């Protein structure tokens, strides 16, 4: 499947402070954030004009699920548009607090852990064909996903009883199973709950919940692009060396704690391999696969950055990727800060900087400031992101949903939508079932819109 439907769901951390002290509970902050949403959507679970879903998840975490995308840059753009949607809610909520005489600064963090040790996720979705053994996909994918943090982790300062240490991944410490149907209790690497949001006879949806939330556009593109390419290779019958892990949960932590990528992890059958070895194998197969697939500039960029990042890890010369890979960008920032102020990694100011890197408010968030200075590379533009706040992807089913929502809202009609249904809540209760996520034109939807 060279053209694949993909999406990213991001849960955001939330807090509200007043002169540096916590002002409101996360529950209260979430209610203020979603008050505007509830006023027009009559719910804290809504679909937007750009085809995305916005809702309040378990534990008062705002969650944004992008619409269906079929290219990497399109997905990165719509993922960033989610930040803008949440930032608009933040600004509105702060104004409401001010109007009510409460005051306070609201923070939304695109990260994966809070100071209390709770974790919230960034879930990737990939449409895959129903035919074929799911177990083969998960067997080949697991070693790749366990070691993928080497190229696309968000970076984190981990406070241990002995000392503070810098790790590749925020999410690695919170994963407890390899493949499972749970998402919160056991937090697997791959979630097997079968909800295709498409024709279930043809497709299933691969739900990957191990990844970090990324700030750098290039890292997001690398994270999703490499996974999609590995899936494509599995579907094409590419043979990989067997890197089945003896204990994926121990391995994911060991990889996260080793910035050199060279520490051996134990494979099934007593063999050993390093994260670098494993990633090199997948990358080598990808380079070969490029020669057999249709040319695609975005996929070629992903394979090039993948190789360059592995070279940087192997040589420990990160200047090759220090504007493109989140954990490298963040580590360089910390090192400069430590050198300038002569402080240890365990200093509370570093922990504050770690959090501020993920603050999505423009002009305040540290990553945004780095990006403005040209210290973080880009794959999309502010103009494209702004357009994606209101406009759905034009090449997938998201266009049908977005056009329907826009038309219904402008006509003042009551409606209900989900990923596959578009329904007018009138006497006739007319409903269109859109089972093909690749289809952006549908006469039934056009007739439904025309009838308004």
From Swiss-Prot:
Positions that bind ATP: 53, 66, 419
Catalytic activity: ATP + [prokaryotic ubiquitin-like protein]-L-glutamate + [protein]-L-lysine = ADP + phosphate + N(6)-([prokaryotic ubiquitin-like protein]-gamma-L-glutamyl)-[protein]-L-lysine
GO BP annotations, alphabetical order: modification-dependent protein catabolic process; proteasomal protein catabolic process; protein pupylation
Binding residue positions for Mg(2+): 9, 55, 63
Pfam families: Pup_ligase
Biological function: Catalyzes the covalent attachment of the prokaryotic ubiquitin-like protein modifier Pup to the proteasomal substrate proteins, thereby targeting them for proteasomal degradation. This tagging system is termed pupylation. The ligation reaction involves the side-chain carboxylate of the C-terminal glutamate of Pup and the side-chain amino group of a substrate lysine.
Name used for this protein in its record: Pup--protein ligase
